[in-house]
Amino acid sequence: MASSFNEETAKKLLTQVEFYFSDSNLPTDGFLNREVTKSKDGLVSLPLVCSFSRMRNLLGLGNINREDIPPRIVEEVANLLRTSDFLKVSNNGQRIGRGTKLSKPEEVLEQVHRRTLAASPFEYSIKMEDVSSFFSQYAKVNSVRLPPNIADKRRFCGTALVEFSSEQDTQDILRQSLVYAGADLVLIPKSDFDCQRENMIKQLGKSESHNEFRRGQIVKFALKWIASEEKVTNKEKPSALKNKIKEKEDKETGIADREKENGDNSCASLCKDNTDQLVVPPWNNSNSVSSEVLKDLFQRFGSVEHIEYSGGLDSGYVWFTDSETAMKARAAVEFVGGLVVKNNFSVALEAINGEMERELWKRLSSAELEGGKEGHKKEKGKDECFENVQPTKKARKEP
């Protein structure tokens, strides 16, 4: 029976099916590997293989179910696959598989990794066929993979993984200086790529965890100016404050429950009224408080993520690394009736609730990631995408 496939389509179909059952793919293809393993003769349904997305595209079948694939198409594909020295087709043309049994998957994967290199940069719209065609000029290519960006799985990361037919070919290519579309290609072993990518995934995980919104971490603080001629009655030495905080820890849970029920309590409800204090806006005093001083103050209770405060204002926000620390700070400040800063200011804390808390979190997150204004600065360069990571070897442009 004459095939209806043209030469180009026939070549692509044969290459695709050989890839499905190859050492490069089968050990890591969970679905197909299970189908092969549970089959006594190692063969699987050819209509099933024809229903794979790339096969459907090559066959022009659209979104058809395997049960609805015309028998004529399956027969033509079977006849085409019989020309392969690598594949085995059943007598009835309904089943397909490898001609030889797959070796131990662990050993096969190790060999594949040694035959593979990572090449970059490639444009994000590039096709696997283009990469394969380019490297086929230098050695036989077994397979090409285009890994997704770790931060956006819908996009190509810019680095192609190219497997050659032998480890020696791979080593020879790594020593060459190649140029693609006017760009010097960076060539590194796959093992280096895997290490760099793993580090990027870890950093991204830390970043996502860090940027996850959690209630109760952000607290508003208010400053009251204490007249110099008045006696400060609530000044606490650091050691005394720590002792009072410790004494208060057993009562924190109850305080937190009351605060949740009365989340809109004013600052005055958290800081005792004191007749010794005269409320005067801090900006009228030359000894205004800096964000660094406030950060040192709040770090008595635990780690502080960010401080939003401009000198001269009478309020700001402190972002603790966890809600437990924020609760401890609020409970302790309420217990001692307000903290005293530089002998001139009393600091009271107030809960933030509802949508306002989420909006503040978005704003403080952006400021913290940008390095902040007067708050603590985050080390930059940790969350860059893999394609920006400096490789271990850089290819130079050909003369």
Curated annotation (Swiss-Prot):
Localization (cell): Nucleus, Nucleoplasm; Nucleus, Nucleolus
Sequence ranges assigned to domain xRRM in this UniProt record: 269-399
Gene Ontology BP annotations: tRNA 3'-end processing
Function recorded in the entry: Binds to the 3' poly(U) terminus of nascent RNA polymerase III transcripts, protecting them from exonuclease digestion and facilitating their folding and maturation.
Compositionally biased residues, Basic and acidic residues: 370-385
Cellular component GO terms held in the UniProt record: nucleolus; nucleoplasm; ribonucleoprotein complex
InterPro entries reported for this sequence: La_dom_prot, La_HTH, La_xRRM, Lupus_La, Nucleotide-bd_a/b_plait_sf, RBD_domain_sf, RRM_dom, WH-like_DNA-bd_sf
Single annotated GO MF: RNA binding
Species in which this protein is naturally found: Arabidopsis thaliana (Mouse-ear cress)
Disordered: annotated segments: 367-399
Superkingdom to which the source organism belongs: Eukaryota
UniProt note on tissues of expression: Expressed ubiquitously (at protein level).
Domain HTH La-type RNA-binding intervals: 3-106
Domain named RRM: residues: 115-192
Protein name per Swiss-Prot or TrEMBL: La protein 2
Pfam annotation, one family: RRM_3
Keywords for the protein's UniProt record, in alphabetical order: Nucleus, RNA-binding
Matches recorded under CDD domains: LA_like_plant, RRM2_La_like
